[in-house]
Amino acid sequence: MLQRLTAALLMLATMTVALPVTGHCDTLGQIKKSAEIRLGYRTDAPPMAFNDESGQPSGYSVELCRRIADAVKEQLKLSSLKVTFVPVTTEERIDAIVNNKADIECGATTMTLSRREKVDFTAMTFLTGGSILSLADSGIDAIANVAGKSVAVVTGTTSQSGLEAYLEKNLIQAKVVEVANRDEAMKRLQAKQVDAFASDQIVLIGLLMQAPDPGAFKLGRDLFSYESYGLVVRRNDADFRLVADRALAQIYRTGQIEQVYAQSFGKAGLRPSELLAAMYAFGALPE
């Protein structure tokens, strides 16, 4: 009897160890219970996410998140839903989702496999690439021109890894200067402490849109990487991600994305690139 009990306990222990940890999340249930959705957003990534002149969250990704919040409200059949904006930095944005400080992150976050070890992403929301910004009189208008010069890049971003890989592959000798954020990079560039600033092209365009004197800068004419953006959500939460993806598909399918794009980038006279237009078309999934 004792032997059979011991064998059964050992088998149970073995089975318990072998069971995978699913870590299922129930963001929709949490939102329904609290009647609140928390939108993490960047304050320093125009035109994707930033605080406007009145201090209100604004930008392309923020607008998409607002519409996803509307879809969540409808899905849960709530009479009202409080939308709370949670500011996050480049360093905090992933952990804010993992640690349940925000339900979705609305910024300029590139989808990568290493990030998917910790979080998940919605369907793609934007396509851009790494480029450089320099002073107008610097003579730098392409990545190759940074040879022998210094380039600022925000620490820990895909722009940093993409730039370093491009420089190594193309045997371009340049000094990569790590900075904490875009504000520091712009200050160093204006003070001529660095020769260029590398970041996602759409973010550099956003900085130019906000600059008092855009003519003082020059945007690089080529890209050193391609970046696909998505909105960050928690892993193992297919139900919430489905609501977000369904909302995005409807926005793409009905042409609402044209309004969102014009609202965010119209002042700069930008039109969606062929790649971005294709992304919208492929993302317009049917019900």
Predicted feature residues:
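Beta->alpha turn/N-cap motifs
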Residues: Y41-A45, V86-E91, N100-T112, A136, ...
